[in-house]
């Protein structure tokens, strides 16, 4: 022992030479027992260190040179002992330290010691395994050699040089070469598995048919050694030995009687020592060799990567075991002992523990299950471990079942390899597990622990054990296998040896193998002994194995033994070797082992299909058969163990091993692989990424002491770890991960025989990739896998989701859940692709239902639950989910999803939306999926064209938006028209006025046409576009059939009235129809949306006609009309939108009820409609919707209704709005805006802040009460009104008007009837509007529907004249609304964008809810209503304001940096590029809220401009002046939002004001325009004077009311644009009046009818007759004439006043918000008063309205004029006063600034003067000092000069010395160069001579060949004969080679037999000694008993004598 220890001590340092030198001695001794002792005892010290490699002793004999068979064995053992002794120490350290020294030293030692030790280890296993194998092979020389070779190979393989060794040594060992070759095949990863298999298969093939039969029968994995073990077990000897072994191992020191018992004891002890080096101390005498062997094995292990892995793993294992021990103190202690005293401490410290462990081992081994249980108990800390451990052998299946029973176990188990993730997780779960797992090499023990720690470990361990169990089962099937099972480790060893056996181990170290041959003999003998011991102690091993697996932790030895036995044992070695083995295997494949090699290939394939390993890991454990397969190829055991051990040993190979074991399982149980692959894949799936992360375990590999080995193994280890993640087919996740998982291929890469591993690698990788297929669920994880954290990601796209999206890499559980749910949700997951990450905004979620219907709406990537909810919530929304693909990421910013997208998406997305947001960054996989989705979306061109409005197909819009930029789509959608406006402000203004409106409508229609469905609508409108639109409004649009007319009308309205709406709604419709076509929510949405819209307009129109129409529509629209639209549509719409909005708004609670219907059913319909109307809006959610939808809808509806349904259009609009819940607020806003004009709310709106808004609402409500139920509620409801209020009002008014009853409508807009009717609809609005004061609006009974209609018309600014005006107002008002709505939409969009960007809880929620903010607030989400009211100051930028493009920005250093700029409502953001924008990777942003001005600025390059903010000035440059101009305009608009006006034309003052007053100004302007329109119409109709005027009175803009609305609009717009330019105003007025004329001409036909209730109804309900139209035209012409007389002057005044007011307000806004607030309060109060006054006058108003109808159509009533003039005057005075005050304040401020600047300048000048003084003084002092120094005289200068001279001289001297040195150096170098030249010449000459010699030889060879040919030719009778002769000669050569191979094989077998004989002899000697000692002890015992009896007799006699004496004394005393 000491000598061997010393030797070993030397080995580490001396390296291979010493190991080799000592190896012969050790080997000679070893086989004899010294080496065995060395192995046994030395492991004591190294044992701890080598505990991990304790298994190595199993293969100890085959140490360095398999060729040195005889010497090798002894030497191997000795070397192992020595090598191990020291190597273990060193190696142990190397294990820890090997990376540094290990690679070099370890490789040597590995080759030598490793060869010996791995060989020993291989022998231990190889002896066991190979002995089994060889016994199967009948002592197949290769078997032993294989063991040795395998052992060596593993080391070599591990070293990768092992391959070389194998290759190099192989030639050396020709006999072993077969095996080596065979082993080479094994050497590949599969070598491990294949080794077992091959050994099983090959053993018989190679060695014996009997062996083969045995292997095939069940000892296939047993090898010859196993066979022997079986035979012994059959003979009972093995069983006895086994028990002895168990005892021996258990008692370490007590060799079981019987040579084999001894051998087994030794082997077992070896293993025990390996497992428990400490034990080996007790065993020292008997186990020294074992210890040494163990140590050597351990050292070889250390030497071999497997061992390194093992060792590392042992360390790690120890560590892990420590970790495991953490689980179980026992384990900890043993492991700690192992670890703590790896070499000395191990055998010293562990010795007691080990002995205890030994005892425990005995118990544990005998109780191996108990140890298992102990392990399990240690594992008990980890139930999986315990269970699996407890189940280890027995519940191989149970373990498998445990795995099955416990998903983790199953997963871990199935995933043990497969779920590296779980493993990783287990590892993660238990660092031990992780570490252990990470130390897969160690993992036999570690893995045992890891398994103990983690089910995987348990699994692996259990797997090994289970393989033991299975092997046991296999063995159970065949006693031999049982023996082997007992030998499972033996089989493990055998398996390991089989691998080792697989000549690959031995062969890889062929030289070693030859040495190992001898050593192999010894080692194999040792191994045989080990095998025998294991075999004999199969239970000991088995138990030991189990204990190793189980006890391993309890007893370090066992753990080490188990782990080492497995891992260190050839198994590990095999794994190590398998790498090396693979090369050998080919030979084996040549040999009978060919079958094994085949398996190897299978293994390789499995290896290739690493995923199989998980399966196999699972299956091996799970299915005994698999294990049998594994067993059969003991490597199965290995596979498990191999996977475990190999994994443990060779992280890489281990991976391979794990993989390999699965692979083996795959090879053997390929089906299992597939099955398990299938199973694990899912599980693993998740882990893939996790697995790779799990790969962290590889880190332990990373720290592998033997990096070179770890490279194969480390890689393998990593691979195993990766592999576990990798192994799982789940690699899917791993696709990315898979490549990582592919790490196992790394081991393959390391594979000495890459060609072999390549197959494995290819297979492995392929399987890995395939496994990824398995974890399709993981697909989620592709990108999501990492992000899997949020299931939503899980489904990037259903299509992408080959894998279940749920298989989130995130977590198995989530993944599992995901997997379970994903099937349904997967589609939804689509949302999550990108959405999942950014899912924050639902809108993206459902860019377009039809597009994404594939995905369940709920499948938000965000979370399954949300997704599910979404799914449940809105099945139709699933498509929305898809939205998330791209949308998800962008979801962060709804803008990307066109607002419509948001709107659409919002409904469904909200639930998942948050989830989406939560789910993950758009990132990774999502992108791809999103892109696909995008492609789908992008395929929808209409959205782009319709993007403006078209976003209705948000999916498309979003797609495009997304594809392009969600923002862009949204902007186009929102601002498409506005952009056109901004681009052509005049045109827009004209359009707003109505002049351009038609074109815009036409454009909208065209756009709509561009969208499929819209085209039909558009076709009508476009066909009729201008006129038909008007007509449709007045006449055709009013066909009484609500459906027909509404449809046509709506189409027209949408097309013409809501240019935007048409544009969008058509698109929406198109998209919706598309959706319908898609069959998603399309039908409902399309039908619901379209019909609902159309019906809304239709019913609205009809409502106008038949009040019942309203009633029906009211209830019908909500229930009936909407049902027509799609019965549920209304409710659906209402609920749906509300739902959507709830989701959007986050008011799902409010929308709770509707959500289910709304979201599920309603959104489809409602969404359809909402999508049509609301979609654009929804995207903006409410804002855009409300504007686009409500504004447009109401505009659209109003235009339709304008004829007869003016109010209805609006009312319907509200319905629609309500229906389009998103628009609810928006609709309310629209209603507010639309109605405001009627109520004057519009007028008021512009300036009203919250108070104004509330007052407005109140005012509206009152007003509504007077004549317009809905109007008031709309106003009262405010936003609510918009949707619910409006709906109520609509419904109420229709009812009230038709029925002439005044119903109280709640501010919610829910009237009792309506609420019941559209409770869902209204509730949504109500919910939404609940934020607004819910004021009951009791609509005063409108006696006549006409009056009501008229009033409503007034309210809607569509009075009967409104019909006229409506055409105008719908166009004008609509344009204004359009602008408003657009502005609002923009705001909404911006808000949407913001919310999306801000990822407000719910984009819609944020949008809608956030919309309601205090005036100062800049809502992240814009509420168009608030914006219109002026509550929200910030309005959406025009299209120009929404801008993207490349520009350069001047950074601080003064460098130009090019960025992708994106202009949003509140900031200018810049990104690296558009992709970064998609990913939301912001480089910076410029806050435009503090922007004061945007000016051109000359820069050196391109065209520059500056953005001035309060904080800084930003300089940017555009490529062209046009781009710069566009940017400046957009920025100015953003800074000073104006509806249509070109901001660039605004005066600075206006610009400043614009920002402030934009919302109010724009709103007021629009309101004014609408109101003006209504008044203008009102002039024609009775309500114009009364209805509109009061409204006008309310509004500051009221002055505008007197002037023609269009002109006023023009003026107001012009004013904002260029309020100071009278000429422009006049020009605009002229244009607008002209346009109005056109409008009126088109609507003239309606005007005549409007005056009378009938007429208005008729206009609303039915198309006008030609006569009527002509009359209307005439009247309108007259009105225009009068209008142009009156209004122009008034307009001039009004606009100025209004402009001044607004400008003033704007100015005041910035300068004095308080004044503005006060003024707004006053106005609101005035509005209230006016409202009450109107109510009071309501009864009179009706008649008056009729009377007013008599007023010439072109004229404005005197009252209205006077009122407007008075208002104008008062407002003008106020404005002038304000201007004066402002001027004074400015003067004061300027004066203060002047003074401050002067003071500052003075201070600066003073400080500068002081600084100059100081500088002058300093300079003066310097000069003075110089002068003084000069005055001192030349003396100082001389001194200084001398000093300088001296310094220079010194320096010169130093330089001269250096020069001399350099000269000498140069001379020396010159001489050297000459010498080299001479040498070179000489070498050249020699080369030439050699070349000549070579040529001569070549010529001789040619002559010989010629002679041979002639000889052959002469022998051949003919060509054919010659050919046959040639063939025969070739055949003879082949036969010769075959015979040589057979000879080598036989030599190997002989060597193995010699080794076995030596082992047996040693066992015999030990047995004899043991018997002698036993007899002696018996004699002593008998003698002692006799003496005791005698002493007792003496004592009894003495006591009797004393008693007698006492009695006598007493008697005497008496």
Curated annotation (Swiss-Prot):
Contains at least 2 actin-binding sites per coiled-coil dimer. PROSITE patterns: PH_DOMAIN (PS50003). Binds to TRIO and F-actin. May also interact with myosin II. Interacts with HECTD3. Interacts with PJVK. Isoform 4 forms homodimers. Isoform 4 interacts with ANKRD24; recruiting TRIOBP isoform 4 to stereocilia rootlets. This is TRIO and F-actin-binding protein. The lineage of its organism: Eukaryota, Metazoa, Chordata, Craniata, Vertebrata. It comes from Mus musculus. Keywords: Actin-binding, Cell cycle, Cell division, Cell projection, Coiled coil, Cytoplasm, Cytoskeleton, Methylation, Mitosis, Nucleus, Phosphoprotein, Ubl conjugation. Residues 142-154, 297-308, 585-600, 638-657, 697-706, 890-906, 913-923, 997-1017 have a biased composition (Low complexity). Residues 130-141 have a biased composition (Acidic residues). Residues 769-778 have a biased composition (Pro residues). Residues 32-48, 155-165, 245-269, 281-290, 316-327, 348-362, 394-410, 418-434, 499-522, 531-549, 558-571, 601-625, 671-681, 808-817, 1018-1034, 1088-1103, 1280-1298, 1313-1342, 1601-1614 have a biased composition (Polar residues). The modification Phosphoserine is found at residues 1598, 1604. May regulate actin cytoskeletal organization, cell spreading and cell contraction by directly binding and stabilizing filamentous F-actin. The localized formation of TRIOBP and TRIO complexes coordinates the amount of F-actin present in stress fibers. May also serve as a linker protein to recruit proteins required for F-actin formation and turnover. Residues 1711-2010 form a coiled coil. Residues 1440-1536 form the PH domain. Residues 184-198, 713-724, 924-934, 961-983, 1040-1052, 1065-1078, 1138-1150, 1263-1274, 1374-1397, 1615-1647 have a biased composition (Basic and acidic residues). InterPro entries: Actin_Cytoskeleton_Reg (IPR052223), M-RIP_PH (IPR039597), PH-like_dom_sf (IPR011993), PH_domain (IPR001849). One of its GO terms (molecular function) is ubiquitin protein ligase binding. It holds the Pfam family PH. One of its GO terms (biological process) is auditory receptor cell stereocilium organization. The gene is Triobp. Ubiquitinated by HECTD3, leading to its degradation by the proteasome. Residues 1-67, 84-1225, 1263-1343, 1357-1404, 1539-1671 are annotated as: Disordered.
């Amino acid at each position: 022992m000491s000598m061997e220890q010393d030797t070993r001590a030397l080995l580490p340092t001396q390296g291979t030479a010493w190991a080799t030198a000592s190896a012969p001695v050790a080997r000679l001794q070893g086989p004899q027992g010294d080496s065995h002792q060395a192995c046994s005892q030395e492991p004591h010290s190294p044992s701890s260190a080598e505990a991990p490699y304790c298994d190595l002793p199993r293969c100890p004999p085959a140490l360095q040179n398999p060729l040195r068979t005889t010497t090798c064995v002894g030497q191997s053992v000795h070397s192992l002992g020595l090598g191990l002794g020291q190597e273990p120490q060193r190696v142990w350290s190397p294990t820890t330290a090997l990376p540094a020294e290990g690679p070099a030293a370890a490789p040597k030692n590995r080759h030598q010691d490793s060869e010996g030790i791995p060989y020993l280890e291989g022998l231990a296993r190889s002896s066991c395994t190979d002995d089994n194998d060889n016994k199967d092979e009948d002592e197949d020389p290769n078997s032993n050699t294989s063991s040795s070779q395998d052992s060596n190979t593993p080391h070599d393989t591990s070293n990768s040089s092992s391959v070389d060794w194998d290759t190099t040594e192989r030639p050396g060992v020709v006999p072993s070469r077969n095996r080596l070759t065979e082993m080479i095949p094994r050497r590949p990863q599969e070598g491990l598995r294949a080794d077992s298999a091959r050994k099983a298969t090959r053993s018989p093939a190679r060695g014996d048919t009997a062996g083969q039969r045995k292997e095939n029968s069940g000892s296939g994995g047993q090898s010859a050694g196993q066979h022997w073990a079986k035979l012994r077990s059959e003979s009972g000897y093995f069983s006895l030995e086994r028990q002895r072994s168990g005892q021996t191992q258990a008692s370490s020191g007590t060799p079981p009687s019987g040579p084999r018992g001894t051998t087994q004891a030794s082997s077992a002890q070896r293993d025990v020592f390996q497992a428990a080096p400490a034990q080996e101390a007790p065993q020292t005498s008997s186990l020294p060799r074992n210890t040494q062997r163990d140590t050597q094995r351990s050292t070889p292990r250390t030497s071999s990567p497997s061992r390194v892995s093992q060792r590392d793993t042992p360390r790690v294992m120890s560590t892990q075991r420590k970790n495991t021990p953490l689980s179980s103190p026992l384990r900890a202690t043993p492991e700690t002992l192992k670890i703590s005293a790896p070499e000395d401490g191990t055998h010293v410290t562990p010795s007691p523990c080990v002995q205890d462990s030994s005892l425990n081992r005995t118990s544990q081994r005998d109780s191996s299950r108990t140890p298992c249980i102990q392990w399990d108990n240690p594992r008990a800390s980890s139930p999986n471990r315990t269970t699996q451990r407890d189940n280890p052998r027995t519940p191989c299946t149970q373990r498998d079942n445990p795995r099955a029973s416990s998903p983790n176990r199953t997963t871990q188990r199935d995933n043990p390899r497969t779920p590296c993730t779980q493993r990783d997780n287990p590892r993660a779960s238990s660092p031990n597990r992780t570490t252990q797992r990470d130390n897969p090499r160690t993992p036999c023990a570690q893995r045992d622990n890891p398994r103990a720690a983690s089910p995987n470990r348990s699994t692996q361990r259990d797997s090994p054990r289970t393989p033991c169990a299975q092997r046991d089962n296999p063995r159970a099937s065949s006693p031999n296998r049982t023996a082997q099972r007992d030998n499972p480790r033996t089989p493990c060893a055998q398996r390991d040896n089989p691998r080792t056996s697989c000549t690959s181990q031995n062969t890889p170290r062929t030289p070693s193998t030859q040495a190992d041959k001898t050593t192999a003999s010894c080692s194999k003998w040792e191994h045989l002994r080990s095998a025998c011991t294991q075999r004999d102690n199969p239970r000991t091993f088995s138990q030991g194995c189990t204990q190793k697996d189980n006890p391993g932790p309890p007893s370090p030895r066992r753990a080490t033994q188990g782990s080492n036995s497995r891992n260190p044992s050839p198994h590990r070695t095999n794994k190590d070797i398998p790498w090396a083995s693979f090369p050998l295997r080919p030979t084996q494949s040549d040999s009978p082992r060919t079958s094994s090699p085949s398996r190897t290939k299978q293994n390789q394939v499995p290896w290739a299909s690493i995923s199989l390993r998980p399966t196999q890991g699972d299956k091996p454990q799970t299915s005994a058969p698999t294990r049998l397969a594994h067993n059969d190829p003991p490597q199965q055991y290995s596979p498990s163990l191999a996977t475990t051990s190999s994994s443990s040993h060779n992280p890489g190979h281990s991976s391979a091993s794990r993989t390999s074991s699965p692979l083996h399982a795959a090879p053997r149980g390929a089906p299992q692989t597939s099955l398990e692959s299938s199973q694990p894949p899912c599980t693993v799936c998740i882990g893939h990424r996790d697995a790779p992360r799990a790969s962290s375990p590889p880190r332990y590999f990373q720290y592998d002491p033997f990096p070179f080995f770890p490279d194969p193994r480390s890689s393998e280890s990593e691979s195993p770890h990766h592999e576990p993640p990798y192994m799982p087919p789940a690699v899917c996740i791993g696709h990315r991960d898979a490549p990582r998982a592919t790490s196992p291929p790394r081991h393959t890469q390391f594979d000495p025989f890459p060609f072999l591993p390549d197959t494995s690698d290819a297979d492995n990788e392929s399987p890995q990739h395939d496994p990824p297929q398995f974890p399709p669920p993981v697909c989620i994880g592709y990108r999501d896998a990492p992000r899997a954290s949020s299931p939503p990601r899980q489904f990037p796209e259903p299509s992408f989701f080959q894998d279940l999206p749920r298989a989130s890499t995130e977590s198995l559980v989530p993944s599992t859940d995901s997997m379970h749910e994903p099937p349904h949700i997967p589609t939804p997951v689509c949302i999550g692709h990108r959405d999942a990450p950014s899912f924050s905004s639902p809108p993206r979620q459902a860019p377009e239902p039809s597009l994404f219907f594939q995905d369940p709406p709920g499948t938000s990537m965000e979370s399954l639950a949300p997704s599910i909810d979404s799914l449940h919530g809105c099945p139709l929304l699933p498509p929305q989910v898809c939205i998330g693909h791209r949308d998800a990421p962008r979801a962060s910013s709804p803008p990307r999803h066109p607002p419509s997208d948001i709107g659409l998406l919002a409904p469904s997305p909200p639930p998942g939306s948050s989830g989406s947001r939560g789910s993950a960054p758009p990132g990774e996989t999502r992108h791809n999926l999103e892109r696909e989705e995008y492609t789908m979306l992008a395929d929808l061109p209409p959205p782009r064209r319709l993007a403006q409005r078209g976003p209705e197909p948000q999916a498309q819009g979003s797609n495009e938006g997304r594809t392009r930029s969600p923002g862009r789509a949204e902007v186009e959608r929102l601002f498409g028209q506005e952009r056109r406006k901004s681009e052509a402000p005049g045109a827009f203004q004209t359009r707003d006025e109505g002049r351009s409106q038609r074109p815009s409508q036409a454009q909208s229609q065209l756009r709509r046409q561009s969208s499929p469905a819209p085209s039909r609508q558009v076709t009508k409108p476009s066909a009729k576009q201008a006129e038909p639109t008007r007509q449709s409004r007045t006449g055709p649009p009013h066909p009484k059939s609500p459906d027909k007319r509404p449809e046509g009308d709506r189409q027209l309205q949408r097309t013409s009235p809501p240019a935007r709406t048409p544009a969008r709604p058509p698109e929406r419709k198109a998209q919706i129809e598309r959706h319908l076509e898609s069959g998603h929510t399309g039908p409902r949405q399309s039908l619901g949306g379209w019909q609902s819209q159309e019906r809304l307009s239709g019913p609205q129109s009809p409502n106008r006609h038949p009040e019942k129409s309203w009633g029906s529509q009211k209830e019908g629209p909500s229930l009936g009309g909407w049902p027509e639209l799609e019965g549920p549509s209304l409710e659906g719409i209402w609920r749906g939108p509300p739902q959507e909005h709830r989701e959007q708004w986050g008011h799902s609670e409010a929308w709770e009820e509707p959500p289910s219907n709304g979201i599920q059913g309603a959104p489809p319909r409602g969404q359809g409609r909402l999508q049509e109307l609301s979609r654009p809006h929804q995207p903006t959610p409410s804002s855009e919707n409300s504007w686009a939808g409500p504004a447009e809808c109401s505009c659209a509806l109003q235009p339709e209704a304008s004829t007869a349904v003016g109010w209805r259009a609006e009312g319907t609009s509200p319905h629609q709005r309500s229906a389009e819940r998103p628009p609810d607020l928006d609709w309310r806003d629209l209603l507010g805006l639309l109605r405001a004009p009627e109520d004057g709310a519009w007028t008021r709106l512009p300036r009203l802040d919250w108070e104004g808004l509330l007052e407005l609402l109140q005012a509206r409500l009152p007003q509504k009460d007077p004549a317009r139920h809905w109007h008031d509620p709309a106003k009262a409801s405010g936003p609510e009104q918009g949707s619910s209020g409006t709906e109520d009002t609509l419904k109420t008014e229709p009812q009230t008007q038709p029925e002439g009853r005044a119903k109280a409508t709640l501010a919610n807009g829910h009237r009792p009837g309506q609420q019941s009717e559209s409770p869902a609809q209204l509730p949504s609005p109500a919910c939404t509007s609940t934020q607004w004061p819910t004021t009951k609006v009791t609509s005063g009974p409108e006696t006549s529907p006409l009056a009501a209609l008229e009033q409503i018309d007034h309210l809607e600014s569509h009075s009967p004249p409104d019909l006229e005006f409506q055409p105008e107002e719908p166009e004008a008002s609509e344009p204004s609304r359009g602008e408003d709505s657009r502005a609002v939409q923009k705001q909404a969009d911006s808000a949407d964008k913001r919310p999306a960007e801000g990822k407000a809880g719910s984009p819609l929620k944020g949008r809608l809810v956030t919309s309601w903010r205090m005036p100062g607030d800049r809502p992240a989400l814009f509420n168009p209503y608030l914006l219109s009211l002026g509550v929200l100051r910030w309005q959406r930028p025009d299209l120009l304001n929404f801008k993207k493009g490349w520009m350069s920005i001047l950074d601080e250093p003064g460098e130009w940096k090019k960025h992708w700029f994106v202009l949003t409502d509140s900031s200018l953001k810049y990104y690296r590029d558009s992709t970064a924008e998609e990913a939301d990777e912001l480089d910076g942003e410029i806050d435009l809220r503090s922007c004061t001005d945007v000016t051109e600025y000359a820069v050196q390059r391109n065209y520059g401009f500056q953005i001035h903010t309060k904080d800084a000035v930003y300089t940017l440059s555009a490529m062209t002046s046009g781009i710069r101009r566009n940017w400046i305009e957009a920025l100015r608009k953003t800074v000073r939002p104006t509806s249509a006006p070109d901001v660039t034309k605004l005066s600075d003052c206006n610009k400043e004001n614009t920002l402030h007053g934009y919302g109010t100004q724009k709103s007021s302007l629009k309101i004014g325009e609408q109101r003006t329109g209504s008044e203008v119409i009102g002039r024609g109709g009775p309500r114009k004077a009364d209805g509109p005027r009061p409204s006008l009175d309310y509004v500051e803009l009221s002055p505008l009311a007197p002037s023609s609305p269009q002109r006023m609009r023009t003026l107001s717009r012009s004013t904002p644009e260029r309020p100071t330019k009278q000429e422009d105003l006049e020009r605009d007025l002229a244009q607008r009046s002209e346009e109005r004329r056109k409008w009126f001409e088109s609507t003239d036909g309606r005007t005549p009818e409007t005056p009378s209730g009938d007429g208005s109804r008729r206009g609303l309900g039915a198309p006008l007759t030609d006569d009527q139209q002509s009359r209307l035209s005439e009247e309108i012409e007259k009105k225009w004439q009068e209008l142009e007389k009156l209004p122009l002057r008034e307009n001039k005044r009004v606009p100025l006043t209004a402009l001044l007011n607004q400008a003033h307000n704007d100015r005041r806004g910035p300068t004095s918000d308080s004044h503005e607030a006060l003024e707004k309060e006053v106005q609101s109060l005035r509005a209230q008063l006016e409202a009450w006054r109107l109510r009071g006058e309501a009864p009179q108003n009706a008649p008056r309205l009729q009377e007013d109808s008599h007023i010439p159509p072109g004229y404005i009533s005197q009252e209205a004029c006077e009122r407007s003039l008075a208002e104008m005057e008062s407002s003008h005075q106020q404005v002038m006063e304000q201007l004066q005050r402002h001027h004074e304040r400015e003067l004061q401020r300027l004066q203060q600034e002047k003074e401050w600047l002067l003071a500052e300048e003075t201070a600066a000048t003073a400080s500068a003067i002081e600084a100059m003084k100081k500088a002058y003084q300093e300079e003066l002092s310097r000069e003075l000092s110089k002068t003084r120094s000069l005055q001192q005289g030349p003396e100082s200068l001389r001194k200084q000069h001398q000093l300088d001279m001296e310094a220079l001289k010194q320096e010169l001297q130093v330089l001269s010395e250096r020069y001399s040195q350099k000269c000498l150096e140069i001379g020396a170098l010159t001489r050297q160069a000459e010498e080299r030249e001479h040498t070179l010449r000489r070498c050249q000459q020699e080369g030439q001579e050699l070349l000549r010699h070579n040529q001569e030889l070549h010529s001789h060879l040619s002559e010989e060949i010629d002679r041979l040919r002639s000889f052959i030719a002469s022998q051949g009778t003919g060509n054919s004969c010659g050919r046959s002769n040639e063939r025969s000669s070739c055949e003879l050569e082949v036969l010769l080679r075959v015979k040589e191979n057979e000879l080598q094989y036989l030599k190997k077998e002989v060597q193995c037999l010699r080794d076995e004989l030596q082992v047996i002899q040693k066992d015999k000697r030990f047995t004899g000694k043991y018997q002698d000692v036993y007899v002696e002890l018996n004699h002593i015992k008998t003698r002692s008993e006799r003496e005791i009896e005698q002493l007792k007799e003496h004592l009894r006699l003495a006591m009797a004598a004393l008693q007698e004496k006492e009695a006598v004394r007493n008697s005497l005393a008496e």
